[in-house]
Design a protein with these regions (language model features):
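Hydrophobic side chains within well-formed alpha-helices
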Residues: 19, 23, 73-74
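Short basic helix-loop element that most often maps to the first helix and adjoining turn
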Residues: 21-40, 65, 90
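DNA major-groove recognition helix of helix-turn-helix/homeodomain DNA-binding modules
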Residues: 42, 61-76
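Short, charged recognition helix plus adjacent turn
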Residues: 1-15, 78-92
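Recognition helix of helix-turn-helix/homeodomain-like DNA-binding domains
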Residues: 41-57
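DNA major-groove recognition helix of helix-turn-helix
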Residues: 52, 70, 81
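Conserved hydrophobic/aromatic packing and binding residues within compact polymer-binding modules
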Residues: 23, 37-38, 48-51, 77
Length: 92
């Protein structure tokens, strides 16, 4: 039942996860090749290329590594926000 509700919510959502164009932009901004990024992810250039084209869903562990590599939030990569970095405030 819960899975059905989640699917329905995602189908009705205006947010579309369009991470693949951002992956390429971030990589190019970092002056890196697909092969270099793939090596950091311990995967092949072919697999990474599929992430950038949207032909393959990126695993969470790769998403986290890329966010750290590029200094952006995972939400930015996923297209859920246009703010690259999450502001962290210290509380006392």
């Amino acid at each position: 039942m819960v899975l059905k509700q989640i699917r329905q919510k995602l189908q009705n959502s205006e947010v579309i996860f369009m991470y693949f164009p951002r992956l390429r932009d971030l990589r190019e901004d970092a002056d890196m090749t697909q092969a270099q990024v793939a090596k950091l992810l311990f995967t092949s250039q072919t697999v990474y290329s599929r992430y950038e084209r949207g032909a393959l869903t990126i695993p969470v562990e790769h998403l986290l590594i890329l966010a750290d590599l590029y200094g952006v939030s995972t939400d930015y990569i996923l297209g859920r926000t246009n703010t690259k970095k999450v502001k962290i405030t210290a509380s006392r």
